[in-house]
Amino acid sequence: MIDLMPKKNTFLLKKKYKEDSNNSVINNLFDFFGKEFCFHQITLTGFPIIWIDKTLLIEVGKFLYHLSQPYIMLYDLHGVDERIRLHREDLPKADFSVFYHLISIERNSDIMIKVPLLENDLILPTFTGLFPNANWYERETWDMFGIIFNNHPNLTRIIMPSTWKGHPLRKNYSARATEYEPFFLNEQKEDLEMEGLKFKPELWGMKRKNDNVEFMFLNLGPNHPSAHGAFRIVLQLDGENIVDCVPDIGYHHRGAEKMAERQSWHSYIPYTDRIEYLGGCVNELPYVLAVEKLANISVPEKAEVIRVMMSELFRINSHLLYISTFIQDVGCMTPVFFAFTDRQKIYDLIEAITGARMHPAWFRIGGVANDLPQGWNILLKEFLDWMPKRLKYYINTALKNSILIHRSKGIAEYNKKEALQWGVTGAGLRATGLNFDVRKWRPYSGYQNYTFEVPVGSGISDCYSRVMIKVEEIYQSLFILKQCLCNMPSGPFKSEDSLTTPPSKECVLQNIETMITHFLQVSWGPVIPENESFQMIEATKGINSYYLISDGGTMSYRTRIRTPSFPHLQQIPSVIRGSLISDLIVYLGSIDFVMSDVDR
């Protein structure tokens, strides 16, 4: 039997180093800029949040970027409408705020910089001079809140159509369609929308021709099979060579962050499944963990192991689809049909446990929905016996094929520095040789108790290394699943906290208050204490996270969902310029994205 006890003090040492690093950077900021210009907000996020005046923004960014152990990655950037927030005690006066979430790999720590803004002065300097991936994040922040970023290279809508009116994440923008005029689409309006989709190269700094050649502009998507969803890339071509390109996203947008403001903390769980629709329970995990931090709910050990088991099953399921469709994009059809056979076995196991297949909505605040059914271990063991042999088949018949290797090795390359500049996470980052897996470096749900390795590349991330990293990750997930099978604890599958679990019959018979509390929490939803929390996880396609702000109500005041696919698509032009169209198809297949994850 595999030992599930934590390895000797490794997790505690990392945690202590992280706390010391946080204290150090706070003191450095206060010493350099002065305490009167920096306000330290205490939250449940697990990292320091520092409010600064907007005049200091670029200087603070440069200061953090050039530390001896620098904050090298802009992980996230977005906004908050602060106007109707009730619990803002001691926070700087603000109608809106913009937050900048930075990560230091060397410190294994984060910091969030917040800038308060008044409604009559919603202007900030662009961060693109320091972090190129700020481009799309600033466009989305303007799109959703109307906050202007001076000197931005192209501050246009990115999620909503160019013809859209208003900024949807403002609090005075209704979340319900019934509060608007009925939608209609006549011929005139259709022409207007089609005109808005017309690509104008000059708006993107592109020339239609140079001295020797007239460029062709080609729409790849939004209905192209190799675009992997409703995704459009406009290519500037010189023959078959890509001179430049512009990714166009937003076709799959469903307003997931806005929906969170009108759903109870509990009833929002089904929406999390659909953020990245192949990840299933993996998507539920960062949300419920973040809510549990806010509510100070401890999860039983059995529930933690079940969560890990389900997450790894969905990870394998997603990776199998990715590997097989990548092989298909390169030109081999057979493996994709074998992969669907293997994925069917996983879905049968998931359905036996949860009652659903792709979108179980099965994790709960405080645990999981049900205990494991009888026979779950037999199904899991059968799958664990089956899968390693099948993986060898994929490797020997397709991934060692000389044509596939020739078509993918050395294609769409980038190094560690470039990956960090663009906010790349997951297999794409680890293929550059950087060993950064959240399950190891920032363990959650008990991952520190499992033995597994983190596959890394040799220094350059290309199409072939990215797919081979995912193959190795399947082997590691199988090893984690074996540990779950051999060491499943007994005990409850859900916390007994009254915020999430109905009272026992004994309590009901003795205390009428328990019934009143239960009635209110079922009808209105649990009331979560005011605070802020954050949780990142190693999802199937990279790092996924939820940043939650509670105002002490039954619904979230602000839910920010940071997905890995969004920055991965933003990186495309910097990687593919100078390559062939055929190389772009292979590159898209190697990224591992779905558009629901990008557009939310």
Swiss-Prot record:
Q: State if NAD is listed as a keyword.
A: yes
Lineage per the UniProt record: Bacteria, Pseudomonadati, Pseudomonadota, Gammaproteobacteria, Enterobacterales
The ranges of region (NADH dehydrogenase I subunit D) come to 214-600
Question: InterPro entries from the entry?
Answer: NADH_DH_suC, NADH_DH_suCD, NADH_Q_OxRdtase_suD, NADH_quin_OxRdtase_su_C/D-like, NADH_UbQ_OxRdtase_30kDa_su, NADH_UbQ_OxRdtase_49kDa_CS, NDH1_su_D/H, NiFe-Hase_large
Q: What is its main location?
A: membrane
Q: What is its EC number?
A: 7.1.1.-
Q: Which Gene3D superfamilies match?
A: Cytochrome-c3 Hydrogenase, chain B, NADH:ubiquinone oxidoreductase, 30kDa subunit
Q: Which family does it belong to?
A: In the N-terminal section; belongs to the complex I 30 kDa subunit family.
Catalysed reactions, semicolon-separated? a quinone + NADH + 5 H(+)(in) = a quinol + NAD(+) + 4 H(+)(out)
MF terms (GO), sorted A to Z: NAD binding; NADH dehydrogenase (ubiquinone) activity; NADH:ubiquinone reductase (non-electrogenic) activity; quinone binding
Q: Where in the cell is it found?
A: Cell inner membrane
Which is a Gene Ontology cellular component entry for this protein? NADH dehydrogenase complex
Superkingdom of origin: Bacteria
Quaternary context:
NDH-1 is composed of 13 different subunits. Subunits NuoB, CD, E, F, and G constitute the peripheral sector of the complex.
Chain intervals for the UniProt region annotation (NADH dehydrogenase I subunit C) = 1-190
Could you tell me what this protein is called? NADH-quinone oxidoreductase subunit C/D
Q: Which organism is it from?
A: Buchnera aphidicola subsp. Acyrthosiphon pisum (strain APS) (Acyrthosiphon pisum symbiotic bacterium)
Keyword vocabulary terms for this entry: Cell inner membrane, Cell membrane, Membrane, Multifunctional enzyme, NAD, Quinone, Translocase, Transport, Ubiquinone
What does this chain do?
Answer: NDH-1 shuttles electrons from NADH, via FMN and iron-sulfur (Fe-S) centers, to quinones in the respiratory chain. The immediate electron acceptor for the enzyme in this species is believed to be ubiquinone. Couples the redox reaction to proton translocation (for every two electrons transferred, four hydrogen ions are translocated across the cytoplasmic membrane), and thus conserves the redox energy in a proton gradient.
Xref: PROSITE patterns: COMPLEX1_49K
